[in-house]
C-alpha cells in the first residue's frame, strides 16, 4: 500500500509541475503576442482574468 501511495504522490507532483510549465508557456506566448502588436486587443470573453478558460 505504501508503494502505491508513493507512486500516486510522485504522479501528482509531476502532473502539477507539467500543468505549471504549460501555464508559464502560455503566459509567455500571450505576452509575446501582446508585444508584437499592442494595438490589437487579445481579450477573449471566454478567458477569465487569471488566464484560465471558463
UniProtKB/Swiss-Prot annotation:
GO MF, any single term: hormone activity
Predominant subcellular localization, coarse grouping: secreted
Disulfide bonds: 25-53
Keywords attached to this entry: Amidation, Disulfide bond, Hormone, Neuropeptide, Secreted
Protein's cellular compartments: Secreted
GO biological-process terms attached to the record: neuropeptide signaling pathway
Keyword Membrane on entry: no
Modified residues (Leucine amide): 36
GO cellular component: extracellular region
Pfam families noted in UniProt: ELH
Protein family per UniProt: Belongs to the molluscan ELH family.
Function per UniProt: Injected in sexually mature animals califin C excites LB and LC cells of the abdominal ganglion and cause egg-laying.
Quaternary data: This protein consists of a large 36-residue subunit, bound by a single disulfide-bond to a small 18-residue subunit.
Protein name as catalogued: Califin-C
Amino acid at each position: 500500500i505504501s508503494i502505491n501511495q508513493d507512486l500516486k504522490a510522485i504522479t501528482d507532483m509531476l502532473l502539477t509541475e507539467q500543468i505549471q510549465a504549460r501555464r508559464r508557456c502560455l503566459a509567455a506566448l500571450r505576452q509575446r503576442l501582446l508585444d508584437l502588436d499592442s494595438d490589437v486587443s487579445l481579450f477573449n470573453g471566454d478567458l477569465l482574468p487569471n488566464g484560465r478558460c471558463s
